[in-house]
Amino acid sequence: MSAPSNKMSATDQMRAMLDQLMGTTRNGDERQLKFSDPRVCKSFLLDCCPHDILASTRMDLGECPKVHDLAFRADYESAAKTRDYYYDIEAMEHLQAFIADCDRRTDSAKQRLKETQEELTAEVAEKANAVHGLAEEIGKKLAKAEALGEAGEVEDSMELMKEIEELRAKKIKAEHEYRTSMPASTYQQQKLRVCEVCSAYLGIHDNDIRLADHFGGKLHLGFLTIREKLIELEKTAAPRKAELKRTGKMTDREDEGRGRNRYFVGGRELDRRSRVHRSRSRERQRNRDGDRERPNNGRGPEEKGSERPKEAADGPERAERAPDRGGRRDDRDNHGRDHRERERDGRRDRDRHGRNDRGRFGDRGGGGGGGGHHRDDRRRSRSRERSPRERRNFNHFRDGGGGGNGQRKRSYSRERNYRR
């Protein structure tokens, strides 16, 4: 029985312990979700889910997509005494998928080292493997001796330390043979190898403390626990699975369906989810770009024409929306053209009215005095500075100078033209 997590509060720990001991019906109420529900993690019921074993490590898989509840485990343990649910078969398939992905990463790391590191001869490679083997054995025994010392078994820990001293002497001899079999410059380079259990990198020059930390670490021990549990399940669950298939209780179709609903862990599934996420993001971006109106930015007709095949190539939806955007651009162009024509007609009318007024005042000014002529010029210059609305009822005055009697006359020509 596993203990509750230390990160939980005291109340949560007591609640979890009661659930684990008494099951889901400890309060007398029936829960809708049962341990037999497909949403419940069957590997968790057997205490071998990789999401829990590798939690808070470098290979942390995050939260399991299925439900983990200690109360379900208690219900399963009590119900499994009277009935066989064959959950060990599903847990075995789960761990097989996980270990297969781990082995794939190990092979990939080995291939990467083979491409980056210098190729060694068969004799030198054999000596290097001997050094690595002794170093791994020392690290494992040292980690075990530390665990025994913490548990209070001092005598067993001292016996392991004696064995470690013998292995260290063998390692020193093997390192000397490895050093003399290759050039000094090549020996100084860091030679790495991949751990067969957790696919981590190990160096040939790592000291005993570094190796003990690795082999006694949570990551390596977690992978070791998963592999040992898989070996145990394959001994018991694999024959049961073959027997079910032989008797017809488990058809091939049910086996394939369970394979489709298998837990996805590791690099392949993460890569697949990443590809799906990127494709969906690109599709959403294309839809937003299609709905958004894009300005022309002053480009000519040749540049706009060159973009039409690109829009059509992006997808049928953008190709269908392209004529609509062109229609909206035409409407904006027509509106601007009409506005410019109206402004041009207004300027022409104002210029024509100004010429008519200058001709009228010049004829009436005749051979009169110069003072009246200058006053008319000042009035006309001030009238041009005013807007048409301000000028339409303007009273033009005329002083005939020597030829007129100085009478005031009003001109209604601009008002009549404006009303037209």
UniProtKB/Swiss-Prot annotation:
Cellular component terms (Gene Ontology): precatalytic spliceosome; U1 snRNP; U2-type prespliceosome
Ranges where the record places region Disordered: 242-420
Pfam families: LUC7
InterPro entries assigned: Luc7-rel
MF-aspect GO terms: mRNA binding
KW Coiled coil (keyword) present: yes
Biased composition (Basic and acidic residues): 242-259, 282-363, 373-399
A single GO BP: mRNA splicing, via spliceosome
This protein's record includes keyword Coiled coil: yes
Coiled coil region boundaries: 99-130
Subunit structure: Interacts with x16 (via Arg/Ser-rich region).
UniProt cross-references to PANTHER family, sorted A to Z: RNA-BINDING PROTEIN LUC7-RELATED
Protein family per UniProt: Belongs to the Luc7 family.
Name the UniProt record assigns to this protein: Putative RNA-binding protein Alsin2
Gene this protein is translated from: Alsin2
